[in-house]
């Protein structure tokens, strides 16, 4: 039975355009794979704390003592055990909301999500075959040749390499804040893309 982890970083909740895309993707995915179990990690509910000095000190002490089964590392264990990862986050300030970065710092734990071999080379320890990143952007960065300014998907794709996740796919609907465009039609096209991607996995 495949475990699918859905990381919800859509700060605006059900009003979020990104979340609408993610919900449609997951709905179709579940219909295509009824035997798979989808677990949602809502970062707005979880309220993970940033790595303040006292939190980092506790984490370092637990890790040094080999207590990787401690509740502090539960998010990392959940992430590492999932067979598929779906992350939904809007495009904010050229990447994504801070709550997602805080989560990524929480799950990036040596000997859980990644490690090192005898040569000192980094090796991924996650089970996931692929990661799907779903996002919406107000501007049309790809169309304008400004892909280099986009740091969210690029960062997550790099982390896939670190975690040992073999395939990264990004579903991004762009230009949604451009009043010259038909935003409703663009969202509808994005929902269709989400359905197609869900059926292809």
Stretch-by-stretch model annotation:
Residues 3, 37, 129-131, 167:
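Residues at the starts of beta-strands that form the adenosine-phosphate
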Residues 9, 136, 173:
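Cofactor-binding loop segments of dinucleotide-utilizing enzymes, especially the Rossmann-like FAD-
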Residues 11-13, 139-140, 177:
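Short histidine/acidic/glycine/proline-rich micro-motifs that form metal-
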Residues 82-83, 128, 165:
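Short, well-ordered alpha-helix to beta-strand connector turns
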Residues 107-112, 154:
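Gly/Ser/Thr-rich active-site loops/lids in small-molecule metabolic enzymes
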Residues 116-162:
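Short, glycine-/small-residue-rich phosphate/pyrophosphate-handling segment
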Residues 143-201:
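Glycine-rich phosphate/pyrophosphate-binding loop and the adjoining helix
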